[in-house]
Amino acid sequence: MNASPLTPPSTDPVAPPIAHARFSIGDVVRHRMLDFRGVIFDVDPVFANSEEWYLAIPEDFRPRKDQPFYHLLAENTESSYVAYVSQQNLVHDDSEEPVEHPAIAGLFDRLDDGRYGLKREHRH
């Protein structure tokens, strides 16, 4: 007699649902409300920064954590920096203008049709 083994209930933590990433590495995007733009160089499927960072955002503007978050080589009229931005706060930048961040040359090739190509040595 072949009895099927019973599977015990899983004790693994349940991962949050993962939303579809709207943007890709190399895309040029801009913030919906703030005056900056940048190139995506990494994507987190859900929020993966510190709770301290999250709580520093004014409550009325805090994005949901259950969405993709993007790491940007960002710029505004005054400086270049790295930004961490939720998907809901980004839109494609259609200006066709290059982003003038000093780290771009180390990660990406030329700008082509609104996106930067990742250099061969950085592709997985």
Explain the meaning of each model-derived region.
Residues 1-28, 34-37, 44-47, 121-124:
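Mixed-charge, Lys/Arg-rich low-complexity intrinsically disordered regions
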Residues 3-6, 63-124:
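Intrinsically disordered, low-complexity, charged/polar segments
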Residues 32, 41, 75:
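Structured beta-strand/turn binding interfaces of compact recognition modules in eukaryotic regulators
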Residues 41-42, 51:
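Short, glycine/acidic-enriched capping/hinge loops at junctions between secondary-structure elements
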Residues 43-44, 98:
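Alpha-helical interaction segments
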Residues 47-56:
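Short, solvent-exposed secondary-structure boundary/capping segments
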Residues 57-63:
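Short proline/glycine-enriched turn/loop segments at secondary-structure junctions
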